[in-house]
Amino acid sequence: MMNIKKLISASMVAVALSGCQRGAVKPNVLFILVDDMQADAIAALGNRDTYTPNIDRLINEGMAFTRAYTNGALCGALSMPSRAMLLTGRGVFEVQSDGMKIPASQITLPEHLKNNGYRTFATGKWHSDHASFARSFTEGDNIFFGGMHPYEENGHCAPRLHHFDPTGKYDEPPFVGQNFSSKVYADAAINFLKTTEHNNQPFMAFVSFTSPHDPRNILPDYGKKYCPAELSVPDNFLPEHPFDNGELNIRDEQLLPVPRTPEQLKKELSLY
């Protein structure tokens, strides 16, 4: 699956690394990830149903890597190894434990910047181990360790989070965020950016949203943006898969009953 993270983070990585190599003024890096968002959900890349002005501006004023793909995974959670690959520059066969653990021998991008004088801040999702997180960041807040916010815990509406632990242990139980996941991560990032205004030390802010990964909880205002009846279904839509590909009982296939109708799919698309 082609992910939106290639649109923003890869270009930021290139700028950061090239700037360091030239010995120029060290650039600040805002590294934004979103979870399970496909590139074909972006208006600037051809989707006529979506309204994505901020992402469109990044594309129109920068660049979009439209032929960049994740090269697979050896586990069910594709985001875990792909995040580890993105952070370390390693291929899928080089990351360990499918990315669940990043060994000290594999330096992450924020760790490299930290070792070169950067403040490194993180908020949101970290889908690897505590030790690699501790090596990578000097500060952070509203940190989520894991893959997704569970349905049974009210999903994005009650994210289980950690404050930054300078010991790197994170052995205290998580607290429940008092707002939607995207807002608590954005608020943490904004609060950090405010501290950089009069600080000459270069920084990297790693802002890792868990949306639009399911559960498809939505903020009330955003639920009104899209009318299901006005959305298009994909050209290759079928009520059910035409043959058993061996993956028909996985979690993603349980989100809607089969046979599926265009109306059901449009409703899910409006939530997505």
Question: How would you name each of these model-derived features?
Answer:
Residues 9-13, 17:
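Hydrophobic helical h-region of N-terminal Sec-dependent signal peptides
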Residues 2-8, 20-272:
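Formylglycine-dependent sulfatase
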